[in-house]
Amino acid sequence: LDTYKTFDEVLESVDQQFEYWTNQMCSSLNIIEEAHREIKPLPYVSAFFEDCMESGKDLTEGGAKYNGTGPQASGMATCADELSTIKQLVFDEKKVTGAELLQAVRDNWEGHEKLYALVNSSKVHHYGNDDDYADELFKYMFECYCRHISGRENTRGGHFSPGVSSVNANVAMGLNTNASVDGRKKGEAISDNMGPVH
């Protein structure tokens, strides 16, 4: 965060991260699907699918008519609020440097109470409040995610389709995540599904 000269560089980095991590995720999911097919086929469940009965193939072999894989993005509103905070406070208003913001996060906001209060206040743009400033950043991230996932093939002859749903995993994910630029402290839940945090 302290090496970027422009916010466009930040957005480019976000896109690169989405590309890298969606590659990792899709590869991992394909390995898991191959393992299911080889180690744990589902003949009993497959018997309830007319398509599987007609094709003579197990669900894990692509016996069903629809064979999509739908990985779900989690914490998107948290990320949108992070980008909004960076854009507003570091680049647009220059109220804090990237290095200072990064240090506050590394310190879990301890010793940075004024900045913590500002980031969590209505003075900073937040996603989901009919605020185009932050909502456009959510849109950008979701478009990155969709672009890097949509149309990829899975092991069953289907395709990956992006979604945004954390169910209740956002709590566990937050427990294992350090503090974030949006004013979330270490261990606090990340955003739920597509819902706003602030």
What are these regions (language model features)?
Residues 1-198:
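Acidic, glycine-enriched catalytic cores built around paired aspartates
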